[in-house]
Amino acid sequence: MKKLMKTVLLTTTAFAMTGMVSCPKARADSGKTLNWSVQSDLETLDPQQCVDSTSGQMLNNTCEGLYRHGTNKLEKALAKSCKVSKDGLTWTFKLREDGRWSNGDKVTAGDFVYAFRRAVDPKTNDSNANLFGSIKNAGDIQKGKKKPNELGVSAPDNYTFVVHLSAKVPYFKSLLAGYPFAPVNRKAVEKYGKKYGTAAKYTVSNGPFVMKTWTGSQQRWNLEKNSHYWDRKHVRLDKVHVMVVKEASTGYNLYQTNKLDMVTLSNQQARNLKNNPEFVTREQGRMDYLSLNMNNEYLKNRNVRLALGYALNRKDMVNKVLGNGSETPLSGVPRDFMTYKGKDFANASHTKNATTYDRKKAQNLWNKGLKELGKSGQDVTLTLLGDDDDTTKALNEYIQSAWQTTLKNLTVNVQCMPKTQRIARMMKHDFDVVYTSWGADYNDASTYLNLQAKDSNYNFGQWDNDEYNKLFAASATTDAGNNQKRWNDMVKAEKMLLNDGGILPTLQPSNATMLKKRVRGLVYNPVGGYNWKGVYLK
C-alpha cells in the first residue's frame, strides 16, 4: 500500500501558490462517534489509484482483502483458509461465503480476479502495479506484451481464489493485507467509470465502514458502520467523523474543546505535552528521505548530491526541529524493520555517505561538484516546495538554513502548497528534490528498495543504476528462495544506492499525538496504520 506522507519539493523554478484552504468548522459528537483528524485532503477511494496516506487510511477501514493488519500481526479477513504448494508458487485461498459489498452483492473470488487484473492493466495506470510483479505474467502485462486476462490468478468457483507466482515471495501474505490487493466491485467500477472512487456516491465498499458525505473536495467527511459487513457484530462504532486539520494550534484547540478525539501535535506541542497522560507517540514504519531529480543540471553530479546530505545535521532535525520521538536514520530502511540471523538491515546497509553530518566535507564536495560541472563560483538557486502543514513548514525552514549557511552561493527559496498539488508535480517528475516519507507496504526491506528500481512508479528522481537493478531483481527472482543470498543482494544494493547519493535519508519519524482516554480498542500497526474496526468509546 503506497503511502506518500508529508513531502517537500525542491525546484529551480518557482511558481505562485494560491487557494490556501481553511480548516473546516468542527462538530463534536458523543456516544458512538469517533472524531478524528488528518493532516491532508482525501484524494480517492479507488484502491487502484491511491498514492497518499490519507486515502490509504480511509481505504484501510472501508475495504477488506484476504487479510487485515492487527496489532503487529496479520489477521484473516475474507480468507477462510490458505494452502501453499510445496514450491511456494501456488496459493489457494478459500473465501468466506458471508462477505458482502455495501450494495448487498456477495464478495466472490471473481472480484479478486477482476481487481488484480485491473491493477496490472496499463490502462488503469495504477501506481501500485509493481507490487503485483511476483504474480505470473504481471511484468509482461504491464509492458503490454500480454493481456490482463493472462495474469496468474483464477477463480475455480465463487469462493476459491488461486494465485500463481513466478518466484517465491517470503512476504506475500503480508503484501495481501494491503489495500492495493483488496477486491473491487466490477459492477460499480464499470457503472461509474473514471468517476469510481472520486466521491462517496461513486464508491462501493466491503470493509467495516462505508464512506458517507464525501463529495470529493471538502475537508470533512463521515464513515459509517457497514450494515452488510460480514463481521459487523464486532464493529462497535456507528460513525467516524474525520476532518482535515493542517495547523497544529487549531487541532489542539479542537481537541481541548472535545471536538476531536485524536490530534497530531507540532514539535513544540509535543515537548510541552509529553508528560500528559493522553500523550501518545508511535513509530510509523516509515522513512523520510530526499529524492533527487537526476535530470537537474546540478543534481546529476554525485558530489553535489552528497554535499546536500553532509550539510544536514539529522540530530538537530529530530531533536530540535521535531522533538516528537523521531530518530536519526542509519540507511534508507527503518531500524528494527527487518532482521536476519540477528542482524538489523538498517545497520547492515549503513554507510557514512548516507547520514553523516560534516560541514567541511559538504563544502568540499559542493565545490568539487560545481567544478566538475564547469559551474565554479556560479550562483545556484533552488526553490523549496512543501506541504502546508506545520511540521513540514518547520522542516522546510531547517533545510533552507542548513543549506544556505553551509554551501557557498546557494540560495533556497521556500514555498508551501496543498498536498494534492505536490503529489501531482512529484508523479510527473516536475521537481528538483522531493522531501518525502515512505510508509511500508509490507514487512520486508524490499518495500523500500523497490522505490528506486528503474521501472518503479515511485522512482521520482529517476535514479538509474544497472547493478542496483540486477541485484534487486535477483532478490525477487533467482535468489528469492535463498534467504542468505537474498539478504546479501538487498544489503549490497542499498549501500550502492546510498553511496551514490541516489537518495538522502533524513529521519525515521514518529507521530506524536493526543488521544482521548475514552477511545478504547484502537489497533495501530506500523505497516497498516490505524484500524478502527474494534474501537469503542467509554
What are these regions (language model features)?
Residues 80-131, 162, 298-300:
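Aromatic- and charge-enriched surface segment that lines or borders ligand/interaction sites
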Residues 226-271:
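Ligand-site clamp/hinge motif
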Residues 311-341, 390-400, 427-538:
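Detector for C-terminal structural segments
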Residues 128-187:
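Surface-exposed binding/hinge segments that line
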Residues 328-369, 391-393:
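Structural transition elements
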Residues 216-218, 359, 367-440, 511:
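Ligand/substrate-recognition segments at binding pockets and active sites
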Residues 165-239, 249:
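Gly/Pro-rich hinge or "lid" segments in bacterial periplasmic/extracellular proteins
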Residues 37-86, 204:
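N-terminal lobe/hinge region of extracytoplasmic solute-binding protein
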